[in-house]
Curated annotation (Swiss-Prot):
This is Rhizopuspepsin-1. Belongs to the peptidase A1 family. Disulfide bonds join 113-116, 317-350. It comes from Rhizopus niveus. Residues 1-21 form the signal peptide. The gene is RNAP. Gene3D superfamilies: Acid Proteases. Its EC number is 3.4.23.21. The keyword Plastid does not apply. Transmembrane segments: none annotated.
């Protein structure tokens, strides 16, 4: 099901009790409305993820620090995609951006783009007094043929009440139809700066740190389930301990390729180990749980799921017959419960929330909406705990 904005933002004066009040700390609640015309597609979600990492289609041959900022997330398309509102320019224009730990660029539609959808909010450089041209260009292309390109510039960016000055932004002058049909206006990358399209560009998190806007180089991520009201929240410079239960487990990060890479030590179903260790990427910009082909096949067999020949699996629609999928990271285990194992319902047929990713493994939103993650860019490491009920 598809969800869209139905009312203006409402700013709260202070953080929740679990998150100490902080200068510029704000929360914004955004009610959601349901669009019954939307039909989720696991196949499309899988292909989008594989294209992002330039892989071929499978089968085709709390407490915060003194300074923090909070950005609420809209749960769009029934946990398919999450976006937050970011204000860019002076005076500011609000853009719906995909907060993506699997990439590092900040780009969005602009009035310079004739191919960008009119349904998108477009940033107009002529209307911002703090806009400055950069002179460089950028271009992104993916394995499925989708692409976007444009120019670099700098402007002020307001991220959850934290004002980043002279943030490098990428203005789209052209985008393919795959981007034009998306509800979001662009993307805000939260990966490491070694994978920015134009080398040497500082990411928004880099600038939050270097400009002293946050006193710790961390951000906490909570992706709400639609069954629990949807939404979600990013907190920059801290985290919200009311959003998780128990204590946080520290997991080291391998960022040698610019991603938030972790080692999954084991995978279990009902106490039975179904796979040994494998490396995976924590990616808020990927909907599904992608597993290496051999792991996906073993998980599917354990659930009695059938291979659809395109990387996805058909699975029983009866959640009472499904046991949680359990991953070991660091010294703890983290679950994907039975209700999250079903991604798409089509009559009597259900499509699983996990898929075969070739040699690629991604702990996407299917995992992240069940587990709170604090990303620490400086160490680097993450801390993970199960979300509170």
């Amino acid at each position: 099901m598809k969800f869209t904005l139905i009312s203006s933002c409402v700013a709260l004066a202070a953080m929740t009790l679990a998150v100490e009040a902080a200068p510029n700390g704000k929360k914004i609640n955004i009610p959601l409305a349901k669009n019954n015309s939307y039909k989720p597609s696991a196949k499309n979600a899988l292909n989008k993820a594989l294209a992002k990492y330039n892989r071929r289609k499978v089968g085709s041959g709390g407490i915060t620090t003194e300074a923090s900022g909070s950005v609420p997330m809209v749960d769009y398309e029934n946990d398919v995609e999450y976006y937050g509102e970011v204000t860019v320019g002076t005076p500011g224009i609000k853009l719906k951006l995909d907060f993506d730990t699997g990439s590092s660029d900040m780009w969005f539609a602009s009035t310079l783009c004739s191919s960008c959808s009119n349904s998108h909010t477009k940033y107009d450089p002529k209307k911002s007094s703090t806009y400055a041209a950069d002179g460089r260009t950028w271009s992104i292309s993916y394995g499925d043929g989708s692409s976007a390109s444009g120019i670099l510039a700098t402007d002020n960016v307001n991220l959850g009440g934290l004002l980043i000055k002279k943030q490098t932004i990428e203005l789209a002058k052209r985008e393919s139809s795959a981007f034009a049909t998306d509800v979001i206006d662009g993307l805000l990358g939260l990966g490491f700066n070694t994978i920015t399209t134009v080398r040497g560009v500082k990411t928004p998190v880099d600038n939050l740190i270097s400009q002293g806007l946050i006193s710790r180089p961390i951000f906490g991520v909570y992706l709400g389930k639609q069954s629990n009201g949807g939404g979600g929240e990013y907190i920059f410079g801290g985290y919200d301990s009311s959003k998780f239960k128990g204590s946080l487990t520290t997991v080291p990060i391998d960022n040698s390729e610019g991603f938030w890479g972790v080692t999954v030590k084991s995978t279990k179903i009902g106490g039975t180990t179904v796979s040994a260790s494998f490396d995976a990427i924590l990616d808020t910009g990927t909907t599904l749980l992608l597993l290496p082909d051999d792991v996906a096949a073993k998980v599917a067999r354990s659930y009695g799921a059938s291979d659809n020949g395109d990387g996805t699996y058909s699975i029983t629609c009866d959640t009472s017959k499904l046991q949680p999928l359990v991953f070991t990271l660091g010294s703890s285990t983290f679950e994907v419960p039975s209700d999250s194992l079903i991604f798409e319902k089509d009559g009597n047929k259900c499509i699983a929330g996990f898929a075969a990713g070739g040699d690629l493994a991604i702990l996407g939103d299917v995992f992240l909406k069940n587990n709170y993650v604090v990303f620490n860019q400086e160490v680097p490491e993450v801390q993970i705990a199960p979300v509170a009920n």
